């Protein structure tokens, strides 16, 4: 069983990319569980065709730890993907990252990881790897990490920050970086820029996902692209990303760059003057 964490700047399309990749792997015959590590509890929406499932934390609050059953918090979605949402604390009370810890520990207690799974995906909130949201890495669950980014400055800035956190954990023997996924925002020289950025981080751009309105069309219909229309070119892009992740055996300790180096890189590729 491979355990994979997806990180990335808020709004970059991380959850969309993760769910479409999960759907692609499921269509290839793999068995998956997706664990949404976001208090908004929207990391499995497309796999569940818009159905909002009860989160682990909401269920714990409603029935108490002793009465929680696995089938109450694990819902089957597209292609048999098992979907879980960690949820979060009540607004203004508690720590969202702590909620992730509680949710994953609950799943383990209930035996969710004993199922015959090929992959577990963790869809993790956060532009930085803070203590709670780093839990899938720190506790030895996630073994490989992919960062979703684009050629925009703030997306690369966030990716670099995430790499700083990963580096600390990787040096202690925890998860390694599997690569960057560029979710295109139609930035000038975007593909070349992200490739070079990845090289400087001691990793690779594992796939470049072109911008496509079909992603939005599928989302409006509450589906992944593969579920919406498996013959679309964009569906093939996600199948290709899934294949590359499945075949990937290059995992590294990242080498984050300075803010000045990032700004120089943006100038080099004509992104900023």
Swiss-Prot record:
TM spans (from-to): none
Cofactor detail note: Binds 1 [4Fe-4S] cluster per dimer.
EC number: 1.18.6.1
Binding positions (ATP): 8-15
Residues modified to ADP-ribosylarginine: 98
Domain of life, per lineage: Bacteria
Keyword Nucleotide-binding: yes
Enzyme class: oxidoreductase
Family annotation (Gene3D superfamilies): P-loop containing nucleotide triphosphate hydrolases (3.40.50.300)
Post-translational modification: The reversible ADP-ribosylation of Arg-98 inactivates the nitrogenase reductase and regulates nitrogenase activity.
GO biological process: nitrogen fixation
Reaction catalysis annotation: N2 + 8 reduced [2Fe-2S]-[ferredoxin] + 16 ATP + 16 H2O = H2 + 8 oxidized [2Fe-2S]-[ferredoxin] + 2 NH4(+) + 16 ADP + 16 phosphate + 6 H(+)
Single GO term (MF): 4 iron, 4 sulfur cluster binding
Cofactor(s) needed for function: [4Fe-4S] cluster
Residues annotated as binding [4Fe-4S] cluster: 95, 130
Sorted UniProt keywords: 4Fe-4S, ADP-ribosylation, ATP-binding, Iron, Iron-sulfur, Metal-binding, Nitrogen fixation, Nucleotide-binding, Oxidoreductase
PANTHER family on file: LIGHT-INDEPENDENT PROTOCHLOROPHYLLIDE REDUCTASE IRON-SULFUR ATP-BINDING PROTEIN (PTHR42864:SF2)
Subunit structure: Homodimer.
Protein task: The key enzymatic reactions in nitrogen fixation are catalyzed by the nitrogenase complex, which has 2 components: the iron protein and the molybdenum-iron protein.
Annotated HAMAP family: NifH
Protein family per UniProt: Belongs to the NifH/BchL/ChlL family.
Protein name: Nitrogenase iron protein
């Amino acid at each position: 069983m491979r355990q994979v964490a997806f990180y990335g700047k808020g709004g970059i399309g991380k959850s969309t990319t993760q769910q479409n990749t999960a759907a692609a792997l499921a269509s290839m015959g793999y068995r998956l569980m997706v664990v949404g590590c976001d208090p908004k509890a929207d990391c499995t929406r497309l796999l569940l065709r818009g159905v909002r499932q009860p989160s682990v934390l909401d269920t714990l609050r409603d029935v108490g730890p002793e009465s929680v059953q696995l089938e109450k918090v694990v819902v089957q979605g597209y292609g048999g993907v098992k979907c879980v949402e960690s949820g979060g604390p009540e607004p203004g009370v508690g720590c969202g990252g702590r909620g992730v810890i509680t949710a994953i520990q609950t799943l383990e207690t209930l035996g969710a990881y004993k199922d015959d799974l090929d992959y577990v995906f963790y869809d993790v909130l956060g532009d930085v790897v803070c203590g709670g949201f780093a839990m899938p890495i720190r506790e030895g669950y996630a073994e490989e990490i992919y960062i979703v980014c684009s050629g925009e400055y703030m997306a690369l800035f966030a990716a670099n920050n995430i790499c700083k956190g990963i580096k600390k954990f990787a040096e202690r023997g925890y998860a390694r970086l599997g690569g960057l996924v560029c979710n295109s925002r139609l930035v000038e020289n975007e593909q070349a820029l992200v490739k070079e950025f990845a090289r400087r981080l001691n990793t690779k751009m594992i796939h470049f996902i072109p911008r496509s309105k079909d992603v939005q069309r599928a989302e409006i219909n509450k589906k992944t692209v593969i579920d919406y229309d498996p013959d679309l070119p964009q569906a093939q892009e996600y199948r290709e990303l899934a294949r590359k992740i499945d075949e990937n055996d290059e995992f590294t300790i990242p080498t984050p760059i300075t803010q000045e180096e990032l700004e120089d890189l943006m100038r080099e590729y004509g992104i900023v003057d």
